[in-house]
Amino acid sequence: MIDFQDVHKAFGPKRVLEGLSLKIADAETMVIIGFSGTGKSVALKHIVGLLHPDAGDVIVDGQAVSMLDRGGLTTLREGIGYVFQFAALFDSMTVAENLTLGLRRRRELSAEEIDDRVREALALVDLSGTEERLPAELSGGMRKRVGIARAIALRPRYILYDEPTTGLDPVTSAVIDRLMVRTREHLGVTGVVVTHDMRSAYTVGDRIAMLYEGRIRQVGTVAEIQETEDPVVRQFIEGRPE
């Protein structure tokens, strides 16, 4: 379980998180929505210890992330896959080499086991046979799928998705949504998805949380969010200007 406990974070005079509290249950997909600049990606970075709160804490599997030493952070991160907004692939490496980067740090895995994981992960995202291709040879949607495969190959307990459908056409976005749902069904992972895309949020989310002015404005099931009477949440999900 992931538990944000009254998390505060500021960058200089700019206060980004101001009392963020949110519990994410095992095996659920939580979607975090909110206006640009409200701290959604900042919240994700706290889960993996890339940022530390000024006050409060994030508890992952009973451990306070800010209290972990280097070894503890390494162990934590081995159980978390991170899908970046722009895939973050190394252009000079093949698809297979991009997937094996994290796996080669797992000393318990043999070369054969690593190759098997790469093949299995690519098959799960419908990219079998692309192992020797370079990122430049792939479409934007395919690169996003490679990013998901890289996370899957770690066999994590958690996968964090940062704007997974940004920059994609509606058809390709629907493919990515389907892959996120399939990943949860096949692997039983807990997912945290940051997005502005409400169609995607409704498709992949078990629950949706609206982050507004540094804290959670509302959290609920898809149906509860769709039927909300909160004016701020309503404005966002309907895409209405003020």
Regions inferred by a protein language model and the residue ranges of each:
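ABC ATPase NBD coupling module
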Residues: 65-81, 105, 111-112, 225-228
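Conserved ABC ATPase "signature" region
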Residues: 63-64, 111-130, 181
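Conserved ABC ATPase signature
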Residues: 134-138, 142
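A short, proline-enriched helix->beta-strand linker immediately N-terminal to the Walker B motif
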Residues: 153-157
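Helix-to-loop junction immediately C-terminal to a conserved catalytic motif
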Residues: 48
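Catalytic Walker B motif of ABC-type/P-loop ATPase nucleotide-binding domains
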Residues: 159-162
